Design a protein with these regions (language model features):
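Extended Gly/Ser/Thr-rich low-complexity repeat segments
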Residues: 103-120, 149-169
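Intrinsic disorder/low-structure terminal segments
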Residues: 51, 60, 72-76, 136, ...
């Protein structure tokens, strides 16, 4: 259950497998994740930062207590979204930092994942000067920067946002692909899924024509 505003909430049922958990991220979320495997207290040498379309800010705090010494370091992320006259989305991100640079590991790398941009163009400036972006092939626009304390990084990703139906269709393909077995019903549903043109066709197909298991239909319909 999550709340919208201060008064009325909305209940959502999110169906997932036992091996995964449902996670909701609001527009503009900036989510830093450590690449370290297992639990630990040292500040990470490599970070993955997930950026979701929208406007948002996040300041990450790190200290040197794991090394039993003083020192603080702050990394600030500011995300902004604009739309061009042609309907393209420009998701920008500015990264600044301050404090004791000795707190973080030397040679830190930050992997930036623009979650809602499945493909697009990247513009990178370091210290106000254009720089080449190290683009990584992944399921969304991803680049890696060699982070230096005190430097300013400006990234702009221009992309055309997927329609709600196209995004749902890709998710439906993953759900059907992950179903147990290869029975004829699943195979037929996967094939006919490719022929759907809009949400109305999809709703009619899965509610009235499909012989898919009820739990699968519920998962397919939950994002409508």
């Amino acid at each position: 259950v999550y709340e919208i505003g201060n008064a009325n909430g909305e209940e959502k049922t999110l169906l997932r497998t036992l091996e995964s958990i449902p996670v909701l991220a609001k527009c503009g979320t900036i989510l830093p994740l450590s690449e370290a495997k297992g639990n630990g207290t040292p500040n990470p040498g490599t970070l993955t930062v997930k950026i979701f379309d929208g406007n948002g800010e996040y300041e990450m705090y790190e200290d040197a207590r794991a090394e039993n010494r003083d020192g603080e370091f702050f990394t600030k992320f500011i995300a902004r979204e604009t739309t061009t006259e042609s309907g393209e989305t420009i998701q920008s991100l500015c990264i600044t930092s301050s404090g004791d640079g000795g707190v973080i590991p030397s040679g830190r790398k930050i992997r930036l994942q623009f979650v809602n941009a499945k493909k697009g163009n990247i513009a990178l400036k370091i210290g106000g000067k254009e720089a080449a972006a190290e683009k990584i092939y992944a399921d969304c626009v991803t680049l890696c920067i060699d982070f230096k304390p005190g430097e300013t990084y400006e990234i702009a990703v221009t992309h055309r946002r997927e329609s709600k139906f196209d995004a749902w269709k890709k998710r439906a393909e993953k759900i059907l692909t992950g179903c147990d077995g290869t029975n004829a019903v699943i195979i037929t549903a996967n094939r006919e899924l490719q022929e759907l043109k809009n949400e109305n066709e999809a709703a009619l197909f899965f509610v009235y024509r499909s012989k898919l298991p009820e739990a699968v239909v519920e998962r397919l319909m939950e994002t409508f």
